[in-house]
Amino acid sequence: MFRSAARFAGKEIRFGTEARQSMQKGVQRAVSAVATTLGPKGRNVIIEQSYGAPKITKDGVTVAKAIEFKDPFENMGAQLVRQVCNKTNDLAGDGTTTSAVLVASVFSESLRCIATGTNPIDMKRGMDRAVGVILQSVAEQSRKVTSTENIVQVATISANGDEELGRLIGQAMEKVGKDGVITTQDGKTMTTELEVVEGMSIDRGYISPYFVTDAKAQKAELEDAFVLVSAKKVSSIHTILPALNHVVRTGRPLLIIADDVESEALTTMIFNKLQGKLKIACVKAPGFGDNKTAMMQDIAIFAGARLVGEEGSGLELDAENFDPAILGTVKKATITKDDTVLLNGGGESSMVKERVELLRGLIDGETSDYNREKLQERLAKLSGGVAVIKVGGGSEVEVNEKKDRITDALCSTRAAVQEGIVPGGGVALLRASKALDSLLGDSSLTADQRTGVQIIRNAVRLPAHTIVLNAGKEGAVVVEKVLENNDVTVGYDAQRDRYVNMFEAGIIDPARVVRVAITDAVSVASLMMTAEAAIVDLPKEETPAAGGMGGMGGMGGMGDMY
């Protein structure tokens, strides 16, 4: 028989119910703090910082990231809440608080059921079937984004109700297109402004995270940078040493876009970057085969560089005969783990226009749908421009907080464009819960599977319930009143305390946000409820400092060494 707790070699292990209840306590405490931010009348949370004034926020994922408990088992639960919030934020840009509320509800109810003898595996099967029905219902409720007004509404909600930021994002999408590149940078005034500049995007990010210059945003930013574009691998540091020496002498950064960079050269570049001797970043070339070479030619023309290593060009990386003319320039390069944005390339505008016209001609004459699509992608990247939102504010803290909100709003707005919008305010999940009534009556379900369905049915009603509670009203009463109305677009406007058509009132969520929130929450809760053991590190025991050592007073003279 397993014991309920055991200690082995600096670790503590808890088993079964005790392990799950310890984690559940941490989950509940963490979600209690996160849930207070949900909805238009959600409350602020004040977070102590390691330096400076406390941070005041209404962003669920920021609250989740700040929570850490002294008890390691409770902390494990809190970290799993943080994990689900982070994942939802990364995939959808919004819905983090909804995810937290859902994971706490599913986990808590499942533990109560397991304690009364419910089989967790069968219960999970029931949950999975319920989630499938929920996702189908959300898809059926979804509407396509048809206007800039819809985009502004989604962006405003995701930016915590900031209408100015929502309007700017709507304008940016209108100018560069729904698939266009929108980026942010620090402004030089108190106001936030929009500017469209010449730019190009590449669907590849940095080769190594060691190139990152902004640890918080996990991106590398190079200002007024040289650009080296190579169709071949950079296999040895010696082949690019003259280029590195050249950029070091000028004091400017270097962006290398190459077929690949092998470990020896990469290690040397990273070492020098970390030592502060070199400002550099490396990106793998986008595309495959002939399309890769063509895209590298596009990049070279945009930056005013010469494509080295191209077959038949006779232009190679040569340590003996380096010509600075092979390097192009960009005013700014922003590189994340997934993509790269180049602004204001040094290429001649006449050559860029000529390249654009060439691509248009190729598109017109192309018969293959696949090839035409690739050509259209290249054309969009070369000619679409980049919308830059210059974020203003009274302090660096204010600017950074605004940039975080814009990043989230951009992510959720793109999600809305791709997968459509659904009624907001928790209504989409609330309506989806009614679709589970027929599943509960399915005779093929076992009793334990039916329990799993019921747990999901209760959980998906909780986000709307929490929004109402945060607005100071009775959650259960409002939820039932919404469900009694047969019009699936009707919900509760917590800001104005009235029942409205959610689409007409502009209270909408991207369908992807709702989909990701329920999927991630149930996935993490299912893993926790089926856990049979939890292992944490024991706190290290402090070794008491040695007191005065009798008879050793003569060693006091060693103090002269300091």
Swiss-Prot record:
Ranges in coiled-coil conformation: none
Function according to Swiss-Prot or TrEMBL: Implicated in mitochondrial protein import and macromolecular assembly. May facilitate the correct folding of imported proteins. May also prevent misfolding and promote the refolding and proper assembly of unfolded polypeptides generated under stress conditions in the mitochondrial matrix.
Annotated phenotype, changing A531T: In strain: PBOL
Range annotated as the organelle transit peptide: 1-8
Keywords in alphabetical order: ATP-binding, Chaperone, Mitochondrion, Nucleotide-binding, Stress response, Transit peptide
Lineage, broadest ranks: Eukaryota, Discoba, Euglenozoa, Kinetoplastea, Metakinetoplastina
Gene: HSP60
Protein name listed in UniProt: Chaperonin HSP60, mitochondrial
Similarity comment text for this entry: Belongs to the chaperonin (HSP60) family.
Subcellular location: Mitochondrion matrix
GO molecular-function terms, A-Z: ATP binding; ATP-dependent protein folding chaperone
Cross-referenced InterPro entries: Chaperonin_Cpn60_CS, Cpn60/GroEL, Cpn60/GroEL/TCP-1, GroEL-like_apical_dom_sf, GROEL-like_equatorial_sf, TCP-1-like_intermed_sf
Main location: mitochondrion
Effect recorded for A534S: In strain: PBOL
Gene3D superfamilies cross-referenced by the UniProt entry: GroEL (3.50.7.10), GroEL-like equatorial domain (1.10.560.10), TCP-1-like chaperonin intermediate domain (3.30.260.10)
Further information: Exists in at least five isoforms that are not related by a simple post-translational modification and may represent the products of different genes.
Induction: By heat shock. There are multiple isoforms that, with increasing temperature, shift in relative abundance from the more basic to the more acidic.
Nucleotide-binding is among the record's keywords: yes
One GO cellular component term noted in the UniProt record for this chain: mitochondrial matrix
An annotated GO BP: protein refolding
